[in-house]
């Protein structure tokens, strides 16, 4: 048995307090966000938020882990065939077993989106397809939610083209806004991860009251 098996909640919380200070720790600990889509963006965003100390997440995806996901998504060979919601929850609890992780293994549609995300004010859009992204963003803005979306992170172009833009007080878009996976050698881990980090960081900023980019 590893030494980590004996680490309790108090030790994890104290380690986060030492890193961030009590004020930031408690703001994050008392916050929650929903992640729609657990692919290259969502699986990495979830990991970053849990490492930062967020108190709760809702993970939503209908898909299972496939070998083709491993080039950019935060999963391992042992997860192939598992629902992404279950695989992500397992990994996140290996980082912090005390974070509250709710899951919903469902296909998000215009008809069910409001009900799925009704208990969350911060929604992270992490879908693959443009039409699904637009559907969720529009649905959540109609529900007066704050949305952090990803758009344009394909290929291996310059990292510096990926930026965070504030569109309205309720909508932030991270990415280069241009590249499509069909045009630039598909999706690769570095730029996908950079975009995921932009989204995770913006969510942290919103939680901590920093709404500018």
Report each predicted region and the residues it spans:
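Hydrophobic Val/Ile/Leu positions in short beta-strands of Rossmann-like dinucleotide-binding domains
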Residues: 35-38, 59
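Hydrophobic residues within alpha-helices
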Residues: 45-46, 88
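N-terminal charged helix/coil linker that caps or initiates catalytic domains
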Residues: 1-33
